[in-house]
Design a protein with these regions (language model features):
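Structural motif
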Residues: 6-9, 23-25, 47-55, 82-85, ...
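Glycine-rich, aromatic-bearing surface loops/beta-hairpins
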Residues: 62-122
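Long, hydrophobic N-terminal alpha-helical segment
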Residues: 1-28
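Gly/Ser/Thr-rich active-site loops/lids in small-molecule metabolic enzymes
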Residues: 24-39
Length: 122
């Protein structure tokens, strides 16, 4: 049902998925990297935008989250080089409310939330 330019959120265990999601998918026993890889096997990223991937910025709250490196590797392996956008936390929540769906995971890494913009299936 998702169309071109619809977005899907993959949230970590701290993400308020139930209160934000229009459509909620629960994958509590899985981490975000595993789910990200599975989603990208089935859903292409949008090639008509500069940054089809968005992350919740940690605003200097500690070091750059190590999980982001995994995301870059997974995206590159599935889609090639893509730009990532960093979003302020509340702006991320606002955008997530408009997403087609939210996948809630059991991910324990902090600032591990990610938004993917769907491309054209060929």
């Amino acid at each position: 049902e998702m169309g071109h330019s619809d977005e899907i959120v993959i949230g970590d265990g701290n993400f308020p998925a139930a209160s934000i999601a229009q459509r909620l998918v629960r994958l509590d026993g899985h981490g975000v990297p595993e789910v990200l890889d599975a989603v990208l096997k089935l859903m292409p990223l949008d090639t008509y935008v500069d940054a089809p991937v968005a992350l919740m910025d940690n605003n200097g709250d500690g070091d750059r989250p190590a999980v982001w490196d995994k995301y870059e590797e997974i995206v590159k392996a599935n889609e090639g080089d893509k730009n990532f956008e960093l979003m302020e936390r509340f702006a991320f929540y606002d955008r997530a409310r408009k997403a087609y769906a939210v996948i809630a995971t059991g991910e324990t890494a902090v600032y591990a939330n990610i938004i993917l913009k769907k491309g054209v299936v060929k």
